[in-house]
């Protein structure tokens, strides 16, 4: 899915799972942009990495922007103006969970799943393996890395899987 892709757009980019993936892909050399309904502390973190973040979700955010891949979560409805434009213009789209799987397939991945304790378990695992320099995307803030995600320098990838979107 990421072959022949340069410009990636995240609708709902301030979400904990979306922001982690956006930061990792930006660090990997992709041009990343996205939108959300409100600014959050993570917005500035992404802007500091060169990620363009639009506040508000309107067609103009995605129209004629050369988007190769549109990433969305279960929070984005078919009535969303950005989503509607992407569908009407046959731009490639992918759900957040599918993108996570696509990225993790390039690594030795560990995904933490379940109904309770995913964030705690994936965070503890991430801290325990920090010296192995893994890529990390979890559902909560990890004090040891001052983020919910980390660009790694190894073959390891730790993620929190979310049953709400089958990731």
Predicted regions span which residues?
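ATP-dependent carboxylate-amine ligase
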Residues: 1-52, 65-70, 88-91, 123
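A short alpha/beta connector and helix-capping loop motif
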Residues: 55-57
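Phosphate-binding loop of NTP-binding sites
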Residues: 4, 24, 47, 60-65, ...
């Amino acid at each position: 899915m990421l072959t022949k892709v340069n410009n990636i757009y995240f609708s709902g980019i301030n979400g904990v799972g979306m922001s982690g993936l956006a930061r990792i892909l930006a660090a990997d050399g992709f041009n990343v942009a996205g939108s959300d309904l409100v600014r959050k502390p993570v917005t500035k973190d992404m802007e500091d990495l060169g990620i363009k973040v639009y506040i508000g979700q309107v067609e103009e955010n995605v129209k004629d922007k050369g988007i190769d891949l549109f990433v969305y979560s279960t929070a984005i409805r078919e009535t969303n103006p950005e989503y509607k434009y992407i569908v009407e213009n046959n731009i490639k789209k992918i759900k957040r969970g599918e993108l996570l799987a696509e990225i993790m397939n390039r690594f030795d991945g560990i995904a933490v799943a379940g109904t309770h304790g995913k964030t705690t378990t994936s965070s503890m695992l991430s801290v325990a393996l920090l010296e192995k320099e893994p890529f990390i995307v979890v559902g909560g803030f990890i004090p040891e890395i001052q983020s919910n995600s980390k660009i790694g320098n190894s073959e390891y990838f730790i993620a929190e899987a979310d049953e709400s979107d089958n990731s």
